[in-house]
Design a protein with these regions (language model features):
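Short, solvent-exposed loop/turn segments at secondary-structure junctions
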Residues: 72-74, 132-135
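A residue-level signal for beta-strand positions that form part of recognition/binding surfaces
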Residues: 124
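A gly/proline- and charged-residue-enriched helix-loop-helix capping module
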Residues: 91-108
Length: 139
């Protein structure tokens, strides 16, 4: 099952206890089966290895602030499992450009140079979407 496989990769992190409790709940097996079936039939964003990227990049013990996004970006090569973040080299989507405008208004020009926000996550910013996966059929 796709979610179980990806959650196993969080083994040894401080998110492990939280997800162990969730995995034991009745809904989780149904959710895992649903996401696994969707990924087998459709394009799902982000790629499986990035579904839990927000948790890998920002340990629970390091969380200082949470920035919630709506759902993953749905253009090829954009979704990386961190809300608002796209790989460097990708054009910043409108929502990220708005964040950059606000940062520059507060901190001055040039403070937002990278579209990949992994460094933010490593500094305690949990960049979490309220929906972790999105299939093309829902767009």
């Amino acid at each position: 099952m796709l979610l179980t496989t990806e959650l196993d990769k969080l083994s040894g992190t401080d998110w492990q206890l939280f997800f162990a409790q969730e995995r034991a709940k009745p809904y989780f097996a149904e959710l895992d089966a649903f996401v696994t079936a969707a990924a087998a039939e459709k394009t799902v964003y982000p790629a499986a290895e990035n579904i839990f990227a927000a948790f890998r990049a920002c340990p629970v013990s390091a969380v200082r602030v949470v920035i919630l996004g709506q759902d993953p970006y749905h253009e090829p090569g954009q979704a990386m499992g961190l809300s608002f973040s796209v790989p460097d080299g990708c054009k910043a989507p409108p929502s990220l450009r708005n964040i950059f405008k606000e940062l520059e208004a507060e901190l001055g020009p040039g403070c937002a140079a990278h579209t990949d926000l992994t460094l933010w996550a490593r500094q305690g910013v949990l960049l979490l979407n309220t929906v972790l996966t999105l299939s093309l059929i829902h767009i």
